[in-house]
Amino acid sequence: MFSIKFKTTEELPEPSPRLIDQVIGQEEAVKIVLSAVKNKRNVILLGDPGVGKSMIVKAVGEILSDFGEFTPYYVIAKPNLKNMERPIVEVIDGEYKEDSKDMPKLDFKAPSSTTLLLIMIGAILLSEYLLKYLPQNYLLAAVTITALIVLIFGFVIILTSIMGASRASMPNNLNPMDLKPVLLYECKKRPLVRASAYNVTRLLGDIKHCPLGGRPPLGTPPHKRIILGAIHEAHRGILYVDEIKTMPLEVQDYILTALQDKQLPISGRNPNSSGATVETNPIPCDFILIMSGNMDDVYNLRAPLLDRIDYKIVLKNKMDNTLENRDKLLQFIVQEIKNNNLNPMTYDGCCEVVRIAQYLAGSKDKLTLRLRLLANIIKMANDVAMGKDVEELLGNFDDKGEYHPETQKDKSNKVYITAEHVRKVFDTGIYSMEKQVALNYIKNFKRYKHIVPNDEPKVGVIYGLAVLGAGGIGDVTKIIVQILESKNPGTHLLNISGDIAKHSITLASALSKKLVAEKKLPLPKKDIDLNNKEIYIQFSQSYSKIDGDSATAAVCLAIISALLDIPLKQDFAITGSLDLSGNVLAIGGVNEKIEAAKRYGFKRVIIPEANMIDVIETEGIEIIPVKTLDEIVPLVFDLDNRGGAERFN
């Protein structure tokens, strides 16, 4: 399984602390992103959730210091005395140091009533001293001088009080502190700034609302209400925007302007705010743009913006099941255990994680790269090993679907994560909402479904296989075909809503009629007038939307059975698509469908030969691969009991 032998992950070396070394399966994408950043090119990363888009950007952010020299800078906001609604924002190279020269001198304020009272008491005490201790010949001069000092001092106090009151009554009065520049941002190393596309204020900046009108002396001046956006904080660095599906069109226009002009002003975003009338000068924002999203998110971007993205990278969601890649997956397991302080995992547990990676990839020779999902399974298996039940596990999911385990405080009693713990998490589906819904549906509805495996042969009755939604759970569908004499021949589909399914059933009907009419099948010949046959096809007890072409072979065989009145054996289930030449084509979800056939108790399952490379488990049921419809006919028709077969049930 792995190139190294071990009993538990405790014996394995610790993973590298560098994120760039912890990226699994996306090495080519990492090289391209590094090259793009080095050459100052814009990048968009597309791929399934959990394949490592954000991790790649974080890993690149850790080594930004290696991309040449960087000049630190800081951003300050100053008032514009000519127009207070147009504050000035400056980007200044160097490290920020608050200069005492920038501190404005405060206006002299009128003394308080307490100060005046103390001055009066002091004057009275001074007068008492002079009257009591000074000689009579100096008394008149001393009193005169004291009176003049008190008079001058009182005049100054009254004058400053009057001027202060008159200044306070002015509508545009500015306190000197309101003239002081404000530090908005200080950048000491090359920045990597992350922002979500839906948060316009965080991305583009804003002007805060002032309930007092935004004008001194009561209000806060505009330059003190500026919120710098991520687009400006990323100056001389990287701006990483995720969730591009939620990006409004107006935000795309602003980003496009910033990419073109390398500068962008900040204005009030809320038209009902006092900041709506405020706009700064254009602020430098020369950055490298990296965006990420799912595959279909790219269609929400404007063409001019998409044209300015130099590298469009699609991340892989699978990798080949080789010894080298299994070792990488083992490295990932060790990383998760180390980073989340989990219990060690046994060798069998690691092998079970690899098996689950095969299932999630849908093939025996592939391993999934949806590593966030695997990480959730590993963390939940750790909790199962510690004795937690399902309800406790479900309570540790966050809004984004990521699982956060509780760390084990007491490790005196060593606990190991085994294959049984990992398998329990996977089989119960607690890592996926869709799988839980599908499992509950099957559990509650299975006893009502009229499916009788290994029953007597029947005419026009066959069992097909399907996968329920996105949960990855297979199910068995009973298909019934009935032929009626009619003047208006045709094919009628019951309980089928998907367009692909309708087209595939039409193909199956046409192919079955062609084969019966040409009498080329290895079956008893029978003259049939197809011009007066009305065909009804029912997917029995199917209440959800049915789509896809994997039931084409099953429907074709059921129609042939009904037309020729030859019974079909009931000990098998079948899946596979067909072309008009009768070739059996590959389908998806083959492992889930085989599991469904085993769960219902069928002895055999027939699948396309092209899907044999995808089959993971072969025990418990006979798996028959086929290439053409001619190979299937001898396997499924009961030619010995034609007369006594049931029509349908």
Curated annotation (Swiss-Prot):
Q: Which parts of the chain does the record assign to the membrane side Cytoplasmic?
A: 1-114, 160-649
Extracellular compartment: which residues? 136-138
GO biological process: one example: proteolysis
Q: Which family does it belong to?
A: Belongs to the peptidase S16 family. Archaeal LonB subfamily.
Tell me its EC number(s), please: 3.4.21.-
GO MF entries = ATP binding; ATP hydrolysis activity; ATP-dependent peptidase activity; serine-type endopeptidase activity
Q: How does it assemble?
A: Homohexamer. Organized in a ring with a central cavity.
The chain's disulfide connectivity reads: none
- Main localization of the protein described in the UniProt heading: membrane
Query: What's the superkingdom here?
Result: Archaea
Query: Which enzyme type, at the first EC level?
Result: hydrolase
Question: InterPro entries in the record, alphabetically?
Answer: AAA+_ATPase, Lon_arc, Lon_proteolytic, Lon_Prtase, Mg_chelatse_chII-like_cat_dom, P-loop_NTPase, Ribosomal_Su5_D2-typ_SF, Ribsml_uS5_D2-typ_fold_subgr
Span-the-membrane segments of this chain are 115-135, 139-159
Q: What is this protein called?
A: Archaeal Lon protease
The keyword Transmembrane helix appears for this protein: yes
Give any Gene Ontology cellular component: plasma membrane
Pfam families named among the record's database cross-references: Lon_C (PF05362), Mg_chelatase (PF01078), Sigma54_activat (PF00158)
Q: Which residues form the active site?
A: 550, 593
- Annotated coiled-coil positions are none
Keywords for this protein: ATP-binding, Cell membrane, Hydrolase, Membrane, Nucleotide-binding, Protease, Serine protease, Transmembrane, Transmembrane helix
